[in-house]
Every structure is written in structure tokens, then in C-alpha cells.
Amino acid sequence: MYNPPSAQEMTYKDHVQRRHEEKGCLYACLFTLCCCFCCYETCECCLETLCCCC
């Protein structure tokens, strides 16, 4: 599997990409939607991920 980055934090986009690789497109899209729902806004990163995901 993947080891976490040692010197730097994982970005949101990296985290979603990792979910996509590990669990598939549907899981990554749901993960992204849940993130946007929790922060009560649709951020640019969420839209990018949803468009690129499926």
C-alpha cells in the first residue's frame, strides 16, 4: 500500500486521489460530496475532483 508523506501533510486533493485509487470512483465522489456538505460550501477543489473523478 501507500506510506503517508513523511515531511509534509497530505493535501485534500491527494487524499481524494488516494481514495480513488484504493476504493474506486464512487467512493471518492461520495467522500468529496461529504466533505463539501460538512463545510457547507462547494469549493473549487470539490468541483474539480467530481469532474475528474467520473
Curated annotation (Swiss-Prot):
One GO cellular component this record assigns the protein to is: plant-type cell wall
The record's subcellular locations are: Cell membrane; Secreted, Cell wall
The disulfide bonds in this chain are: none
Q: What induces it?
A: Down-regulated in root tissues but up-regulated in shoot tissues in response to cadmium (CdCl(2)).
Report any one BP term from Gene Ontology.
Answer: response to cadmium ion
Please give the start and end residues of each transmembrane region.
24-40
Keyword terms: Cell membrane, Cell wall, Membrane, Metal-binding, Secreted, Stress response, Transmembrane, Transmembrane helix
Topology of this chain in the membrane: Single-pass membrane protein
Q: In which tissues is it expressed?
A: Expressed in roots and shoots.
GO MF entry, a single one: metal ion binding
Q: Does the keyword NADP apply?
A: no
**Summary of the function given for this chain in its UniProt record:** Confers resistance to heavy metal ions (e.g. cadmium (CdCl(2)) and copper (CuCl(2))) by chelating them at the plasma membrane of root cells, thus stopping their entry and reducing their accumulation.
Give the record's family classification. Belongs to the CYSTM1 family.
Tell me what this protein is called.
Protein CADMIUM TOLERANCE 5
